[in-house]
Amino acid sequence: YQETNKIFDNRNSYSKTDHDATFMRVKEDPMLNGQLKPAYNLQIATSGQFITNFDIYQNPTDTRTLIPFLNKQIKNNSLGKYIVADAGYGSESNYRFIEDKLTNNIPLIPYGTMLKEQSRKWKSDDRKVMNWYYNAKDDYYLDPNGVRFNFNAYCKRTDKHQFTRDFKEYEAEKYDIN
């Protein structure tokens, strides 16, 4: 049991034939169905169509590879002025790292729901808090049913990767569902 735990090393899976590989969803069949196969996550940085840096990670998600990859580029002095990546790299922890540590760089990384938020369907969805009326002076939201959500407290949450998020908590005033 302890040996198996040691092989896992902060992962959810590993291959019995290649302990360094992690099971990842790969889209290699014609229907693009994601099948779990032992794999690695390759990251490549380019500038002017030349490869300036690369690294291989056991982590299946791009979100958690960005910070170590940027640190490697800083160490190798290969980080360009612009940091360009797709929405798979967009996360609060990545944005905060770039804002705090890489103040001379310009990040061009959309967040995961950016394109959806620009759609007519999203903008007309009354369940989305961003579509509710907000009063900045008194710090409250009004939902489409007229229920008022008042500011309650500042909160912090730390995820399993030790990233702490700061957010505001709102509480609904009494509401009769009938």
Predicted regions located by residue number:
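Anion-binding and metal-coordination hotspots
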Residues: 1-178
